[in-house]
């Protein structure tokens, strides 16, 4: 979404001074690869903070690329401990437009933060659907 709207990426975050390696270790099993890798700080009052209700949460980390410059119209929702953008949304969007860098779908039923995110997405889908006419 960031690139499509005019933003840019770091192609190899691990090679950027000041950033740690966000890639998974392929020698580990899937549970370990997708396990919590680091914490992210949620922007107070932001969409993600309102959904989760906490200042920070642990997330998995399996990515080599990362946001470099955020596109105009996007808002940072969370950052990693090294300052890398881990989540963003579209400012003043009429619907649910949250992008995250981690994999909240992994073992979702065991992760209350992921459950809250997907619950908010589902509620937004239902709200959108309720505004549309149904075929007769």
Q: What is the predicted function of each stretch?
A:
Residues 14, 18-136:
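Amide-donor transfer/coupling interface in amidating biosynthetic enzymes
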Residues 6-11:
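Post-Walker A helix-loop "phosphate-sensing" segment adjacent to the P-loop in P-loop NTPases
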């Amino acid at each position: 979404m960031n690139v499509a709207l005019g933003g840019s990426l770091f192609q190899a975050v691990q090679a950027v001074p000041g950033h740690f390696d966000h890639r998974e270790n392929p020698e580990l099993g899937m549970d370990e690869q997708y396990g919590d890798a680091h914490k992210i700080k949620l922007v107070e009052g932001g969409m993600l903070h309102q959904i989760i209700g906490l200042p920070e949460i642990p997330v998995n980390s399996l990515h080599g690329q990362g946001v470099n410059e955020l596109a105009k119209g996007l808002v940072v929702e969370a950052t990693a401990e090294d300052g890398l953008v881990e989540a963003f949304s579209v400012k003043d969007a009429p619907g649910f437009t949250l992008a995250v860098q981690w994999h909240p779908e992994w073992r979702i039923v065991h992760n209350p933060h992921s459950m809250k995110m997907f619950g908010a997405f589902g509620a937004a889908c239902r709200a959108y659907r309720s505004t549309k006419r149904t075929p007769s």
